[in-house]
Amino acid sequence: MEVNIEKDESIDDLQLNGLQLIQKNEGFRFGVDAVLLSHFANVKKKHRVIDLCTGTGIVSFLMYGKYNPSEVVGLEIQEEMVEMANRSAKLNDITDRIEFVKGDLKDKKLLDSLGRF
């Protein structure tokens, strides 16, 4: 899948079902806390998962790779992070199962529009 990678970004192998993640070379990069958080989630295949304040989407991708839920939605307030996370979904050819939405988790109407999780 052809995906645009910016000069200040890298593609990192998540070592999980071939999944890859686009991240900035400088600034926030995921660490062990995201790996642990996704490990302790109790997700089943039939579940819809929401990842609040998703950032790069790392927890969303790890939960998708580990548990294969029916759908994952990542919510993030920063447009640049949403765009990067959606490019990662495209890179992994999983845009039919995982999507990232720009929004504020304090926006009740937005949360209601996303449905039940």
Where in the sequence are the language-model features?
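Class I SAM-dependent transferase core
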Residues: 2-44
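Conserved SAM/SAH cofactor-binding pocket of Class I
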Residues: 40-117
